[in-house]
Structure formats: C-alpha cells, structure tokens
Amino acid sequence: MRTFLFALRVSDLVRSLAFYTKVGYVELSKIPFEDGSSLVWLRLPGESSVSLELVHRPADGPVEAGGFAHFAIEVESLAETIDRLTAAGLDPGEPELPGGPDGPKTSWVVDPDGYRIELVEWPPSGAPTFD
C-alpha cells in the first residue's frame, strides 16, 4: 500500500495551475464536469505517477484551508529552488535550519488559496529513515 495522491480544493483553477507550474509540477490530465467543476492531475518531474490533484468546485463556495497544515517537496538545492521560484514571480521565504546546522534546510511558499508548501533540502546524511 502507498499514498497515491492528495487533493487540494482551489478557488481559481487557472491561477492555481499557473502557481503549481511555476513550482515545477506538470499537468497530466484535466477532467471537466458539466456542472463547471474540474479535476486536474499533476506530478513533479521524476515522479512515476500523479501526486497532486487540484479540485475546482465553484458551486461549493469559498475555499478554506481549514485544518490542512502543509505538504513538503524535497529539493536537491534549496538555494537554486528559491532563486528559480523568485524569478518566476513567487515569494518563497528565507532559508531556515529547523534541525540546527546539521539538519535539513527549509523554506516555505504559500499557494493562492493559502496552502503552505515546505521546501526541504536534506543534509548529506540524507532524510530520516524509519524501520
């Protein structure tokens, strides 16, 4: 068993697709429905299948992030990722060292609906493993 994808409800599909494309996601499939709703499947380069679904349901009213805390994207170089996102017009936060100097480097960026995305560069020792 494994996680297939997670879905985010978005208020403006065009704006959200532009944001996630700037982050690095690639659109795989778009499914429009007669009621004006749409689903869009995305993945990051290097992923073998869909990892993110954007759900646009205009009839459901305003989008609220609610109890959603964040999701994380592993990056090879946090500095290069921050530079690329900034050049694309996004506003990633300053690098942080939440685990101290030997831990991961992180930064945060927020999507148009307020969903927080953590960008993580693991130290040379790698990501933590759990048995």
Model-flagged regions — what are they?
Residues 39, 72, 106-107:
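Short hydrophobic/aromatic beta-strand element in the GNAT-like acyltransferase core
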Residues 36-38, 67, 103:
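Exposed loop/turn and edge beta-strand positions of beta-sandwich/beta-sheet ligand-binding modules
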Residues 19, 79-84:
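Short amphipathic alpha-helices within nucleic acid-binding modules
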Residues 2, 7-49:
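Core segments of cupin and vicinal oxygen chelate
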Residues 30, 82-131:
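Vicinal oxygen chelate
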Residues 1-17, 68-71, 123-131:
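N-terminal beta-strand motif that seeds the catalytic metal site of vicinal oxygen chelate
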Residues 12-13, 75-79:
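Helix N-cap motif at beta-to-alpha junctions
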